[in-house]
Amino acid sequence: MEGLNLVATALAVGLGAIGPGVGIGIIVSGAVQAIGRNPEIENRVVTYMFIGIAFTEALAIFGLVIAFLIGFGVLQ
């Protein structure tokens, strides 16, 4: 049963990181395009970009918390 907990932990971390990774890539790509088209709004775009990255990265942190809960046997 310990082996299945390790597999579940690995899946929680791995799959929990795919979505935020893609999301952050899309956010940064959009920010770079926006700054390239209109360099005067760089400060505002960068601020919104970091806010978006923080919210997106929270999803990966939730996946990591779930993985810890599975790994330590709190969730089964």
Swiss-Prot record:
The chain crosses the membrane at residues 7-27, 50-70. InterPro entries: ATP_synth_csu_bac/chlpt (IPR005953), ATP_synth_F0_csu (IPR000454), ATP_synth_F0_csu_DDCD_BS (IPR020537), ATP_synth_F0_csu_sf (IPR038662), ATPase_proteolipid_c-like_dom (IPR002379), F/V-ATP_Csub_sf (IPR035921). One of its GO terms (biological process) is proton motive force-driven ATP synthesis. It comes from the Bacteria. The record marks 57 as: Reversibly protonated during proton transport. It is a multi-pass membrane protein. F-type ATPases have 2 components, F(1) - the catalytic core - and F(0) - the membrane proton channel. F(1) has five subunits: alpha(3), beta(3), gamma(1), delta(1), epsilon(1). F(0) has four main subunits: a(1), b(1), b'(1) and c(10-14). The alpha and beta chains form an alternating ring which encloses part of the gamma chain. F(1) is attached to F(0) by a central stalk formed by the gamma and epsilon chains, while a peripheral stalk is formed by the delta, b and b' chains. F(1)F(0) ATP synthase produces ATP from ADP in the presence of a proton or sodium gradient. F-type ATPases consist of two structural domains, F(1) containing the extramembraneous catalytic core and F(0) containing the membrane proton channel, linked together by a central stalk and a peripheral stalk. During catalysis, ATP synthesis in the catalytic domain of F(1) is coupled via a rotary mechanism of the central stalk subunits to proton translocation. Belongs to the ATPase C chain family. This is ATP synthase subunit c. It comes from Chloroflexus aurantiacus (strain ATCC 29366 / DSM 635 / J-10-fl). The gene is atpE.
